Swiss-Prot record:
Cofactor note: Binds 1 Mg(2+) ion per subunit.
Positions in coiled-coil regions: none
GO CC list: cytosol; succinate-CoA ligase complex
Residue span(s) of domain ATP-grasp: 9-254
Function summary: Succinyl-CoA synthetase functions in the citric acid cycle (TCA), coupling the hydrolysis of succinyl-CoA to the synthesis of either ATP or GTP and thus represents the only step of substrate-level phosphorylation in the TCA. The beta subunit provides nucleotide specificity of the enzyme and binds the substrate succinate, while the binding sites for coenzyme A and phosphate are found in the alpha subunit.
Stated name of the protein: Succinate--CoA ligase [ADP-forming] subunit beta
Biological process, per Gene Ontology: succinyl-CoA metabolic process; tricarboxylic acid cycle
Length: 399
């Protein structure tokens, strides 16, 4: 689960992390009061969407002006003008895709006199089962680009969960960022604060880009992005309360209600599979034969008829889907349950695109019989390769 920048900063502030003062704004009429509260003389007006690259992004609407999603204002009138332009407009960034995202919230923040910019992040390293830190002197930039062009400028290290953060971790960060004296001590303290926040709130990723040194000689978090471990949300009602469903794909929200693992993608072939590994293999082979998957969807091993029907409805609700591939290898999941769910869903919502079904495993004969006797226009497949070729061919023929 992701949250907005202003929410992330409020959370970090609880752990003593140095963040700039700011005020969230939902309506343009609130901008003037927010700016007056902060005092100026410089303000930063920030679009709040769940995507990076806001500063370099562009709004679709001409009325929003030519500037990006993060704007520097030198007067209260400018703050008001920017708020009026940006709220309700659609911001397109490198991470939103061409559709962009509507800006429904702003964060008006006090300006900072910046001397240096750094990159700092913490994330769960699944290979080591530890929290890893990534730091770089190249702040304010795309860290993937830095890793590609100048990997020597990135320093990483992990923390043993048995000991937690120790003083040498802080010194490692200070040394990597070339911070000495009081700034080095601030860096050591910051590492402990961020680690404590990460653990206490069950975060999956914490990214600060940039972490800055002000001209007053202070470390300050200028931008913060936090993702939480969804499996741990039951322990954090306060974090769940921060969820902004308007920033999430409606199909993904619906899928979560049925405990389905669903991720919307940009392709044209909808997929329903049991097992994450098989789902990824299915997506790969669709790409191999020249088309792209419209989603990742794992119905899991214990799916019921209703759950399968819900999954099918979610796939067909995507207007980009031009064909559907169902690939089931029944172990715990029974093929006849899948078949019952698909038939029930098709009878409710109809079927206007080609459908290929590949069933193998537990109760496979019963499953094939249910589909065969349903009267549905379904293309059966013998194996995954056959299924992928058939759905790609069927979609291309319809197009």
């Amino acid at each position: 689960m992701n949250i907005h920048e202003y929410q992330a900063k409020a959370l970090l502030r609880e752990f003593g992390v140095p963040v700039s003062r700011g005020v969230p704004v939902l309506q343009a009429s609130e901008a003037e009061a927010a700016a007056e509260t902060l005092g100026g003389p410089v303000w930063v007006v920030k679009s709040q969407i769940h995507a990076g690259g806001r500063g370099k992004g562009k709004f679709k609407e001409a009325s929003a002006g030519e500037k990006g999603g993060v704007r520097l204002a030198r007067s209260i009138d400018e703050v008001k003008t920017f708020a009026g332009q940006m709220l309700g407009a659609t911001l397109v960034t490198a991470q939103t895709g061409p559709a962009g995202k509507q800006v429904n919230r702003l964060y008006i923040e006090e300006g900072s006199d910046i001397d240096k910019e750094f990159y700092f992040s913490a994330l769960v390293d699944r290979e080591t089962s530890r929290i890893s830190f990534v730091v770089s002197t190249e702040g304010g930039m795309n860290i993937e680009e830095v890793a590609h062009k100048t990997p020597e400028k990135i320093v990483t290290f992990s923390v043993d969960p048995a000991t937690g953060v120790m003083s040498h971790h802080g010194r490692t960060v200070a040394r990597a960022l070339r911070l000495r004296g009081d700034l080095g001590k601030q860096a050591e303290k910051l590492v402990t604060q961020l680690y404590d926040a990460f653990i206490a709130r069950d975060m999956a990723m914490l990214e600060i880009n940039p972490l800055v040194v002000t001209k007053q000689g202070e470390l300050r978090v200028l931008d913060a992005k936090i993702s939480f471990d969804s499996n741990a949300l039951y322990r954090h009602s306060d974090v769940v309360a921060l969820r902004d469903e308007s920033e999430e794909d409606a199909k993904e929200i619906e899928a979560s209600r049925f405990d389905l693992s669903y991720v919307a993608l940009d392709g044209q072939i909808g997929c329903m599979v049991n097992g994450a590994g098989l789902a990824m293999a299915t997506m790969d082979i669709i790409k191999l034969y020249g088309m792209a998957p419209a989603n990742f969807l794992d119905v899991g091993g214990g799916a019921t008829k209703d759950k399968v029907a819900a999954a099918f409805k979610i796939i067909t609700a995507d207007p980009n889907v031009k064909g559907i591939l169902i690939n089931i290898f029944g172990g715990i999941m029974k093929c006849d349950v899948i078949a019952d769910g698909v038939v029930a869903a098709v009878k409710q919502v109809g079927l206007n695109v080609p459908l290929v079904v590949r069933l193998e495993g537990t109760n496979v004969d019963a499953g094939k019989k249910i589909i065969r006797e349903s009267g549905l226009n379904v293309l059966p497949a013998d194996d995954l390769d056959d299924a992928a070729q058939k759905i790609v061919k069927a979609v291309k023929e319809v197009a």
